[in-house]
UniProtKB/Swiss-Prot annotation:
Gene: thiC
EC number: 4.1.99.17
Family: Belongs to the ThiC family.
EC category name: lyase
InterPro entries, alphabetized: ThiC (IPR037509), ThiC/Bza_core_dom (IPR038521), ThiC/BzaA/B (IPR002817)
Disulfide bonds: none
Keywords: 4Fe-4S, Iron, Iron-sulfur, Lyase, Metal-binding, S-adenosyl-L-methionine, Thiamine biosynthesis, Zinc
Binding site for [4Fe-4S] cluster: C407, C410, C414
Gene Ontology molecular function: 4 iron, 4 sulfur cluster binding; carbon-carbon lyase activity; zinc ion binding
Source organism: Thermococcus kodakarensis (strain ATCC BAA-918 / JCM 12380 / KOD1) (Pyrococcus kodakaraensis (strain KOD1))
Coiled-coil segments on the chain, per record: none
Chain residues that bind substrate: N66, M95, Y124, H163, S185, R186, G187, D226, G227, L228, R229, E265, Y292
Designated name of the protein: Phosphomethylpyrimidine synthase
GO biological process: thiamine biosynthetic process; thiamine diphosphate biosynthetic process
Length: 428
């Protein structure tokens, strides 16, 4: 029985109790949101060692970090380090997007390296296995696709991106629609190309009920992928994106009827003034399903800094209802990220998430309140304790030392020290 089914029966599961205690929220309220499908819980029944995480209404905005090998760079040790660094700096979940090497072994190794939920995109494996055989991606059969999905579910992944909304109808529409960037979703493109080649319907859409059966068996959260998300600002909010969104909304309702947990993925690249409207539209179209966004990236002309462009968009999206932020690293659009890129990406996304969480949770705001008090007293030891990135705190303090109580920016001209000294004198 899934978390959704248990919640509908009025049962507060052990996972709900764990999450409620961790987040400092009421377990019964969490149960009600899970029962409605407004909140999902990541915890595959076979992933015994995972610490469950909730995404959606009434809980904190969460951050995901993507890692994984590529066909050009297969370094499993590096990916394990990335996973551990991501978790260290605050990633709530990890997605293994590996496309090179022994994908089964890599996935299992990553899952055992961390205790957070792990997500995947199974069709990547189906596509990679075709290339490994010297075949074209479009030669994969429906059986190949389903085999990959079931393998990932059995291995214990907690959520999977399935591009169910890339239908034959929307692919036909794509032929008549001009886009600046085209399709940028790998999984979505694999399916679109397959549909164009064979003239057949997307197997995951055609046999959606079977997908629901599999997901229900393992209580895997289906992350309904946005295969037609905008890959550049000019494409934001176009006909293809919105058509897919409404398809996903219908599929969310079918999943809920089947007792399967679902969330919906969103853009992408979106001008800053459109983000609020896009998030609110998605929430309406999907009946308040948890919304998982990649960024959104708010400008396309700063490659090397897309962790920042994404954090800006992510904060606005989260403030307007997005529940789950997929980090973006400085390497986005340029190459496979290294460990340092992962660290920077996680921190940027955590800043965006925390900026919103502190407006909703007293415990989160208290951290900032305590930091303000510490700064007001020039209490550097306390500021260090409260810092989210302690290594960076120490690094900059050592690089730019001062002989004063203040920092090397102001030294004896420190505003805080001056006014504190003057007020102390007045009190005497």
């Amino acid at each position: 029985m899934t978390q959704l089914e248990e919640a509908r029966k009025g049962v507060v599961t052990e996972e709900m109790k764990f999450i409620a205690e961790r987040e400092g929220i009421d377990a019964e309220k969490l149960r009600r949101n899970v029962a409605k499908g407004y909140t999902v819980i990541f915890r595959n029944v076979r992933h015994d060692w995972v610490k469950p995480v909730a995404v959606g209404a009434g809980v904190r905005v969460k951050v995901n970090a993507n890692i994984g090998t590529s066909r050009d760079i297969v370094d499993v040790k590096a990916e394990i380090e990335k996973a551990k660094v991501a978790v260290k700096y605050g990633a709530d979940t990890i997605m293994d997007l590996s496309t090179g090497g022994d994908l089964d072994e890599i996935r299992k190794t990553i899952m055992h390296a961390v205790d957070v939920p792990v997500g995947t995109v199974p069709i990547y494996q189906a596509a990679e296995e075709m290339l490994a055989k010297g075949k074209a991606i479009i030669e994969m059969s429906e059986e190949d696709m389903w085999r990959a999905v079931e393998k990932h579910f059995k291995d214990g992944v907690d959520y999977t991106t399935i591009h169910v909304g890339v239908t034959k109808e929307v692919v036909e529409k794509m032929k008549r629609t001009k886009r600046a960037v085209g399709m940028v979703s790998r999984g979505g493109t694999f399916l679109a190309a397959w549909i164009l080649h064979w003239g057949e319907e997307n197997p995951f859409y055609k046999d959606y009920d079977y997908l629901l059966e599999l997901a229900r068996e393992y209580d895997v959260v289906l992350s309904l992928g946005d295969g037609l998300r905008p890959g550049g600002l000019p494409d934001a909010g176009d006909e293809l994106q919105i058509a897919e969104l409404y398809t996903l909304g219908r599929l969310v309702r079918r999943a809920r009827e089947a007792g399967v947990q679902t969330m919906v993925e969103g853009p992408g690249h979106v001008p800053i003034d459109q983000i609020a409207a896009q998030v609110k539209l998605a929430k309406v179209a999907t009946d308040n399903a948890p919304f998982y966004v990649l960024g959104p990236i708010v400008t396309d002309i700063f490659p090397g800094y897309d962790h920042i462009t994404a954090a800006i968009g992510g904060a606005i999206a989260a403030l307007n209802g997005a529940d789950f932020l997929c980090y973006v690293t400085p390497a986005e659009h340029l190459g496979l990220p290294d460990v340092e890129h992962v660290r920077q990406g996680v921190i940027a996304a955590k800043i965006a998430a925390h900026a919103v969480n502190l407006t909703r949770f007293e415990a989160d705001f208290k951290k900032d309140y305590l930091m303000a008090l510490a700064r007001g007293k020039l209490n550097w030891a306390r500021q260090f304790e409260l810092s989210m990135d302690k290594e960076r705190f120490v690094e900059i303090r050592k690089e730019r030392p001062t002989k004063t109580e203040a920092c090397s920016m102001c030294g004896d001209l420190c505003a805080i020290k001056l006014i504190n000294d003057m007020l102390a004198g007045e009190r005497k």
